[in-house]
């Protein structure tokens, strides 16, 4: 009995021993695997990846292509050159290959050569664009984005148009304003810089921009800017003056045609014998002969006797003893008569629409007063 009782007691530990040993062995295996992985991570963390070469991918590709005797390489040959030259491309990191492919396809300085017959599939040769070789001379690897040359070529016309907007080469060869007896022709090179800038500022309206009247439409500029341009204009004298008012413009005669004898007359005979008048106080009147349909004797005049004699007062104010006229043209008339002065709103559009036929469209004004002044002849 004792032996039978002892046998189960001996067998029970034998059956229970494998159950107790298994839980003890499994944690040991897990800890060993985790310790090996951490050791591997520690060893990998200690090893640093080689430093990237201090060149852009464009420069690296150019180095590879220029190293070839034929100046062309395939994509795989470019990979081999970079891996043999720089340790950075030998590691486990493979993202640089995508960068090489993108730079080859996205930059215009690289050209994909067409493959010959009998070579299907991959393996295209890449070379450097001959127009872009200057970018990489003497080791100067300058990055140029896609479409750089197109942008440079597109900027050239815009710069040219901007320079034209400032008044350079802005006027065509001639402006012909047909009036009663002829036309006005102004060369394009005589436009001053101030008048060109005034055109851009919008002081001259529509069709009157080419006549160079910047001195009469821009109070902030000196009047010699307009006269310097009109002084170089040449006009064809007409045979007769039309039957309308002659106060259209101090620079033009009654028919819209500049008299060549009236531009910059430097003799003293062009000045009136009467003492100089003053325009500062607005009390004196300028004498002028009326040319109206009511006066038939004044309707036709010879071109040799010009109605207006234009003179710049700032050039002759010391010789003639006048200090009140500052940059305002003076006039000499054959038979002076009293004229009235009226205020009006200065408008170039009215002058162009009426072709300078209305008596109220005068092109000069007195700047010292608030409103512009018009010197008009009395209609008899």
Swiss-Prot record:
DNA-binding region, residue range(s): 52-146
Residue stretches of biased makeup (Polar residues): 1-19
A GO molecular-function annotation: DNA-binding transcription factor activity, RNA polymerase II-specific
Gene Ontology CC annotations of this record: nucleus
Primary localization: nucleus
Keywords of the record: DNA-binding, Nucleus
Subcellular compartments: Nucleus
Pfam families recorded: Forkhead (PF00250)
Listed SUPFAM superfamilies: Winged helix' DNA-binding domain
UniProt cross-references to PANTHER family, sorted A to Z: FORKHEAD BOX PROTEIN BINIOU, FORKHEAD BOX PROTEIN F1
Full protein name: Forkhead box protein F1
Species in which this protein is naturally found: Danio rerio (Zebrafish)
């Amino acid at each position: 009995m004792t032996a039978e009782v002892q046998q189960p007691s001996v067998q029970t530990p034998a059956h229970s021993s494998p159950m107790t040993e298994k839980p003890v062995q499994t944690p040991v295996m897990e800890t060993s695997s985790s310790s090996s992985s951490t050791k591997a991570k520690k060893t990998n963390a200690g090893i640093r990846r080689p430093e990237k070469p201090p060149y852009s991918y464009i420069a690296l590709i150019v180095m590879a292509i220029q190293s070839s005797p034929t100046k062309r390489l395939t994509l795989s040959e470019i990979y081999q050159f970079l891996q043999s030259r720089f340790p950075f491309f030998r590691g486990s990191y493979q993202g640089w290959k995508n960068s090489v492919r993108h730079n080859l396809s996205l930059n215009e300085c690289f050209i994909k050569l067409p493959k010959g017959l009998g070579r299907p599939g991959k393996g295209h040769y890449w070379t450097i664009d001959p127009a872009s070789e200057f970018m990489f001379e003497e080791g100067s690897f300058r990055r140029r984005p896609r479409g750089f040359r197109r942008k440079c070529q597109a900027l050239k016309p815009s710069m040219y148009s901007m320079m034209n907007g400032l008044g350079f080469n802005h006027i065509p060869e001639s402006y012909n304003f047909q009036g009663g007896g002829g036309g006005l022709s102004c060369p394009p090179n005589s436009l001053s810089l101030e008048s060109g800038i005034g055109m851009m500022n919008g002081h001259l309206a529509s069709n009157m921009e080419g006549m160079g009247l910047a001195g009469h439409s821009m109070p902030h500029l000196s009047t010699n800017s307009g006269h310097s341009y009109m002084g170089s204009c040449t006009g064809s004298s007409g045979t007769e003056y039309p039957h309308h008012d002659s106060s259209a413009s101090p620079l033009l005669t009654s028919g819209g045609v500049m008299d060549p004898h009236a531009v910059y007359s430097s003799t003293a005979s062009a000045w009136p014998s009467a003492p100089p008048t003053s325009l500062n106080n607005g009390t004196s009147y300028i004498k002028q002969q009326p040319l109206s349909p009511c006066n038939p004797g004044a309707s036709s005049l010879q071109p040799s006797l010009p109605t207006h004699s234009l003179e710049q007062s700032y050039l002759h104010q010391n010789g003639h003893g006048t200090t009140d006229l500052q940059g305002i043209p003076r006039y000499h008339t054959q038979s002076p008569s009293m004229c009235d002065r009226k205020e009006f709103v200065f408008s170039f559009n009215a002058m162009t629409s009426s072709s300078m036929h209305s008596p109220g469209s005068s092109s000069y004004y007195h700047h010292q007063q608030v409103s512009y002044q018009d010197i008009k002849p009395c209609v008899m």
